[in-house]
Curated annotation (Swiss-Prot):
Pathway: One-carbon metabolism; tetrahydrofolate interconversion. Transmembrane segments: none annotated. It comes from Bifidobacterium longum (strain DJO10A). One of its GO terms (biological process) is purine nucleotide biosynthetic process. The gene is folD. One of its GO terms (cellular component) is cytosol. The lineage of its organism: Bacteria, Bacillati, Actinomycetota, Actinomycetes, Bifidobacteriales. This is Bifunctional protein FolD. Signal peptide: none annotated. PANTHER family: C-1-TETRAHYDROFOLATE SYNTHASE, CYTOPLASMIC, C-1-TETRAHYDROFOLATE SYNTHASE, CYTOPLASMIC-RELATED. Gene3D superfamilies: Leucine Dehydrogenase, chain A, domain 1, NAD(P)-binding Rossmann-like Domain. Belongs to the tetrahydrofolate dehydrogenase/cyclohydrolase family.
Amino acid sequence: MSTKIDGKQIAAEIKTNLAERVNKLKAQGIQPGLGTLLVGEDPGSMKYVAGKHADCQEVGITSVKKELPADASFDDIAAAVRELNEDPACTGFIVQLPLPKGINENAIIDMIDPAKDADGMHPYNLGELVLHVRGDISTPLPCTPRGVLELLDAYDIDLNGKEVCVLGRGITIGRTIGLMLTRNAVNATVTLCHTGTRDVADHMRRADVIVAAMGSAGFVTPDKIKDGAVLVDVGVSRVYDEEAGRYRIKGDVDKACYDKASAYTPNPGGVGPMTRAMLLANVVEMAERHA
């Protein structure tokens, strides 16, 4: 029987631990704070940011919110980033992406103080991840890849020497999880598949673990995986449900794969809650480093 990897449960346990650590920091006169910069009124982005602040309230982290209109200029956004860099109430912060059309997102991310980069996506912090194959890393780690590894660890899924096939090369998960999986502490062997990969299914069938992050609904089907594979579904697609008359979130892994797998993350309810929990963890760890 395959094991359902419950991201909601593990994220809840992590948040309980973080709340205890926040209380210890407060006893030392240190109040962790998460800042968010939201530009425009995209419903998805607004909902996501609201969820982050609800998480903050749950563990005792202060919310620092900055909002700009959709027609904000590059200079307006840059000024808001500088304000968050200098705000002592803000331990770490994120710039909610995507930014409005025409705004250079990479240039904005570059302006974030690496020590306040709650998403772990600043070039300096990614560089630290590239350089430090051994030992501990004291800089923030990308939230989604970290969440995946924490989730697998919570279920005692050993990745040492395992063949891991990563589907998708986006910076949020595909490229960065490869760096984390190949660190000495994890020691997996990684194949990164993308749009230029020949015979993706052949790579998938050899994998002990598949991390699907393509945004292609139901791409991973039973004929493409081996018996007993571990399936981690990070893909997000909005698919119209004719019966319900509305859009639903669907992952990259077809549910028909679950019986063939040894373990799987549902989607939604698998990796998503862990990504949010890791954002909080990054902020608490930033505060602890300055305690």
